[in-house]
Amino acid sequence: MDMQSKAKKLIEMIQTAPVEWKPLGEVLVRTKGTKITAGQMKEMHKDNAPLKIFAGGKTFALVDFDDVPDKDIHREPSIIVKSRGIIEFEYYDKPFSHKNEMWSYHSVNKHIYIKYVYYFLKTQENYFRNIGSKMQMPQIATPDTDNYKIPIPSLETQQKIVKILDKFTELEATLEATLEAEL
């Protein structure tokens, strides 16, 4: 079966799959960040340290586990909500923390595949940016994501969607790297 046939079959499967719509805060666990300033992050940063601390946009610091209180270290695959400035979602599946004005979600529900939710939220970033743009400094609050309803198809459907989107993401990265190398 060629890629176009697979894509048509996937679209058909999604359109006919039973879907429940539930608020994000009802189906995922929201976690808090750590109290840290940009200056402290810069001071603590060590190249190749094992723990990533996320801040707004593309800003992060690599630190040692001892640098952050254990209660603020998240070890589950998660969606990090970058809630100020550039509003976006990031998926991360290694131990991490983030600044306390941000939050993250992970799943303890065996019927929810966190990476599926991440891919869905990526398609909704403009919605959240529009909410955030009403402020002088763009930002959203936890109720904005907690109360946001997401479609929840069967776990099997979620896994198929993620498998296909992971392939597309990988192909896109390969294509970008190839184009950059040629230029």
Predicted regions and their residues:
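Extended macromolecule-engaging scaffold surfaces
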Residues: 2-9, 28, 32-40, 52, ...
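A short beta-sheet element
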Residues: 58-122, 134, 141
